[in-house]
Structures are given as structure tokens and as C-alpha cells.
Amino acid sequence: MPVKKIVNRSNSGIHHKISIDYSKVLTTNTPQKSLLAKKKKNSGRNNQGKITVRHRGGGSKRKYRIIDFKRNLHDDKIALVKSIEYDPNRSAFISLIAYENGYRSYILTPQGIKVGDKVVSSSQAIDIKVGNCMPLEFIPEGTMVHNIEMTPGKGAQIARSAGAYAQILGKDDTGKYINLKLGSKEVRKFLKNCRAVVGIASNVDHNLVLLGKAGTTRHKGIRPTVRGSAMNPNDHPHGGGEGRSPVGRDAPRTPWGKRHMGVKTRNNKKSSTQLIIRRRNSK
């Protein structure tokens, strides 16, 4: 997908801005009204009004697009891609598809799909074609997949962002699981009846985007981040001191005093640990 670098730099704020030329890919259709829902902003606050997630607030108004992550309601029915649209709630694009029976839904757009293409979802083996959805056991080794379920029937949870994918490595010795190599290089087992979509998630050039100025970040609903070393000691463990002082501890800390950076956070007692063959950071 072509990226668009700003040539007419009217001010220094957009001197390094790089954006995506959406006109080459997206259609101009208005969103399907029946598949929109209200999205309330919480600005990172909980029900008591306390900040639980920092750096959230403001930004443009959004409506939530209801995405079909399960793709199991209309098995073996051909669906026609009607439009490819921008979704402000995610980095990948979404496609409006219309089934033979008139039902419409949004799905994540696979890379390379176009308006007028046909996609199918099934619980059985079907053509290995970009956009088709089926259980992992029917997809051959080496195939790139995205929109992957972790629990059969729950809906996709893995490889949903722009350019994300996993590679099928084959069945394990029991024949009950399929081994997948995720984008993080982690190798993990998935139940063979978990569904996945063939192909790579759309908008693969998303990682090349440079926002260029602080105002664009604010439009996204992200507020500024203040360095801990610029705070007072009562606000952050890194705060205080004369001038530019070092951390003064054995390791960097979070604002709440816990060790930060390079600390393992996964609980090895989780039952799913036995499904991980190789951790993402193992050599």
C-alpha cells in the first residue's frame, strides 16, 4: 500500500509527517448504520472517577463498528465484499460483506482483497483462498493466517492488528493441537477446531506512519507523557534531586514503585503455559 510523505511542509510540525494514502485502497461508502454502536469515552477513569489508565482523554468522537470475529453464523454461504472501510477503533481496515441471504456484517480486511471478491466461512475444508475462514486443521503447513481463535466458538483474539499474521507449523504428536508461530516468534499450540482466516491482516504499511506533531496524537485521544525524572519525589520514584539526577535505585521503577523494564510479568501457574512451546523472548 502506498505511503504518502508530506511534500508541502507549511510548518515545522509536519516536517517529518508520513501518512497512508487511503484513497488507493478504501471506498467512499458511509458506514453501515445497523452495524454501528455508541462508544462512551471514559478518559482512563473507573466507576469512581479515578485514573486507572494514564495518558487517556480527549480525541475525536468515534462510533464502534460491530465486527464479526466468529464468522460462524452463515457457514458455507458465499459472501460478496461490498466495501473496504477505515475503522477508527483499530489499525487494520474492515470490509462490509453481504451474504446470499441478504445478511450483512463487518469483517477484518485481509491484505490484497478487493471490492467484488467472494469469501466463504465453513466448519469443513474449503479453498485455501485469502479471506476464507475455516478450522486450523484444514489449513496446510506454511500458510499465513490471521484473526485466530484461542477458544473454539469464542471469536478471534490473535493476529487482529494491521499487518499481523501467524504461520502454521503443523500438528503436534497428539493430533489434537496445531502449532502456530506467532508474530512475536512465540510458538504456541491451538486446538485444531479453532478457526482462522487465510492471509495477512490489511494495512501492512501502518508501521511506517509518522504522526509528525503532537496535535495528531491528541486527536487520537492520547494525552502527554511526563518523564518520572521531571517530577517531584512524592509523584514518582525517579523524581527529585538537583538538576538531572540518575534514577538512584537498582532498577527503573513504575510510578507505583514496582520494578520496570525487562521484568517478566507472566504467571507460570496459568494453565495455558503448557500450550506455549517456545516463549517469544527465548533464544
Curated annotation (Swiss-Prot):
Gene3D superfamilies: 2.30.30.30, Nucleic acid-binding proteins (2.40.50.140), Ribosomal protein L2, domain 3 (4.10.950.10). The lineage of its organism: Bacteria, Bacillati, Mycoplasmatota, Mycoplasmoidales, Mycoplasmoidaceae. GO terms for molecular function: rRNA binding; structural constituent of ribosome; transferase activity. Residues 37-59, 219-283 are annotated as: Disordered. Keywords: Ribonucleoprotein, Ribosomal protein, RNA-binding, rRNA-binding. GO terms for biological process: cytoplasmic translation. It comes from the Bacteria. One of its GO terms (cellular component) is large ribosomal subunit. The keyword Ribosomal protein applies. InterPro entries: NA-bd_OB-fold, Rib_uL2_dom2, Ribosomal_uL2, Ribosomal_uL2_bac/org-type, Ribosomal_uL2_C, Ribosomal_uL2_CS, Ribosomal_uL2_dom3, Ribosomal_uL2_RNA-bd_dom. The gene is rplB. One of the primary rRNA binding proteins. Required for association of the 30S and 50S subunits to form the 70S ribosome, for tRNA binding and peptide bond formation. It has been suggested to have peptidyltransferase activity; this is somewhat controversial. Makes several contacts with the 16S rRNA in the 70S ribosome. This is Large ribosomal subunit protein uL2. Residues 256-269 have a biased composition (Basic residues). It comes from Mycoplasmoides gallisepticum (strain R(low / passage 15 / clone 2)).
